[in-house]
């Protein structure tokens, strides 16, 4: 896990590409330094609902495209499997990372695992819709693969742990 470590230039570039492709080119990327700061960022009351809406619109469009290319039952089984496995794996990794930092906040660990499972679902949806490696959800998933936890946009900042 790279959470809490300084951001690599490639991670900053991916984060900037992700938020820009969602329609937020002026949002800056900020590193979140530890689990406690991550909890505060995740619970910020002024998180961007526009960011969430942009992701949701993109998800719906991808799902529509994926359903035009794949049988619905097969697609749903595959997406459920991806989400379930990602949740199982990421929960264990998040728990270990948090414990090493002296954090035992089970709710925060579940949030981190849920975010990873959602990113895996979104990346699988990109594949099912025959999207490319630079689709915003594929880029977001790369951040998770690098051991990062995108915490969303608060104000004019994309928080990356």
What spans do the regions from the language model cover?
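Short, glycine-biased loop/turn motifs at secondary-structure junctions and
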Residues: 1-161
